[in-house]
Design a protein with these regions (language model features):
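Well-ordered beta-sheet/strand-loop patches within structured domains
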Residues: 1-200
Length: 200
């Protein structure tokens, strides 16, 4: 990636179809796991996002998931969706860089390789804000369901800010902030009979 050039994750990885070699795996849709072609690509884009942060590159487009993910620290994920959501960054360094990624069973690694003059002398990636968004319990009635009572567990949301601070030996400095708003999901309890609803 030459100096001043932009990297697009979606453009680089191409259409996530079976014809292009992508397999079906779980994908997160509206906060729920569902099977889809290319499931798991967000783990690669999130790992790349963290490598970009540590290399001191400039992130130009990044979106968090609907809910926090387990494979990167809170606020340091980058979701992608073909034709809708991309992860992009720019090489604003003095020299070109290479993006090298490697897969091994159970792990993904991404390196940003380049000129030693562009290697930061100081990097700090830290949370500057973490707020909890509460969730509610919602009771409903559905006479058509088989179960007497069905519960869909919810979870709290999070509002997080992560700061990227980078310094180079020649005096250059770079800072950026990344906001992540993870939605709260209400617990929904559905009863077959209206008479079973809890009394308020």
């Amino acid at each position: 990636l030459k100096p001043g050039a932009d990297f697009s994750y979606n453009r680089t990885t191409g259409s996530r179809s079976a014809a292009n070699g992508y397999k079906e795996a779980p994908v997160i849709i509206n906060g729920k796991l569902e099977p889809g072609s290319g499931g798991g690509v967000c783990q690669v884009s999130s790992t790349l996002f963290n490598a970009v942060l540590l290399a001191g590159l400039e992130v130009t487009q990044r979106t968090c998931h609907f809910s926090p993910v387990s494979y990167v620290p809170l606020g340091r994920d980058a979701t992608v969706a073909e034709g809708v959501i991309d992860f992009c960054f720019r090489n604003h360094l003095k020299h070109g860089v290479y993006v090298y990624a490697e897969y091994a069973p159970g792990s993904i690694s991404v390196w940003i390789l380049g000129n030693k003059e562009d290697k930061p002398s100081y990097v700090d990636i830290s949370k500057t804000k973490e707020e909890t968004v509460p969730f509610k319990t919602v009771n409903r009635v559905d006479p058509s369901q088989k179960e007497e009572q069905k519960t869909e567990e919810g979870h709290e949301g999070k509002n997080v800010t992560v700061k990227q601070s980078v310094k180079w030996a020649d005096g250059r400095v770079y800072h950026d902030l990344f906001e992540s708003d993870y939605e709260a999901v209400d617990t929904v309890i559905t009863y077959k009979n209206k008479e079973d609803l809890p009394k308020e």
